């Protein structure tokens, strides 16, 4: 009954194909996905998010097989936007990166269970992660749209303002930062940029979709100074850069060779930054969430429950 309730909520028959995993050509049906959602603890109202997230993950540019089979240890991060956040009780304030509510906890868990049970992405089988990280259990957050002067992440990625949406990303574990000693946007963002550079030296030098999670205290300093998404992204694009010679400082000098002066940027362009407003009200905290091995996998944003680029049905006489 619980599985059927999920299917009824999204108006899908059990045998409807959600998508096909492109490498191994495995079909994911609505029923199989609903079964895993129910096992994860999802209510019917959560299921549209699970469906949209899975559809986004099956896009070629996401490279689902690569992200789930890699030794690199990434997990699937799901970011929620739009009215559905309030409808399902997804919180975006306290403990936002720590499974702060039922909705985000079970949605993230449903994605992981579906990968394991439908696509056999279990440790030691398809999943070859050397270490992994706790986000493999559940990795889902909601953006604090009401507490931010910015347009939402989804809007910045061409989703209409009145549509709910998910953004999926093959993501490493969060790297928390703190800067409570300045109100200047440049100095605050220097702390974020330093953490991005540290990831480039210690994990992967390749550019990709970095997530910046910015809590209210830092956002307020940005607002007072007149800094929005564009200014923040442009600044980090310029500051989050390393030279290959810097690898010598972290024990990787043998791979520098004659490329020591080659400069690498964390972001292919400012538009590749995924800036998310979220977090509790107190404290000068934020987080960097690095991508899995650069641009091999790209973040995908999709509307929930609607098709924005579908062809209209043919007119009938």
Model regions: which residues?
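Non-transmembrane, aqueous-exposed alpha-helical and coiled segments at domain scale
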Residues: 1-317
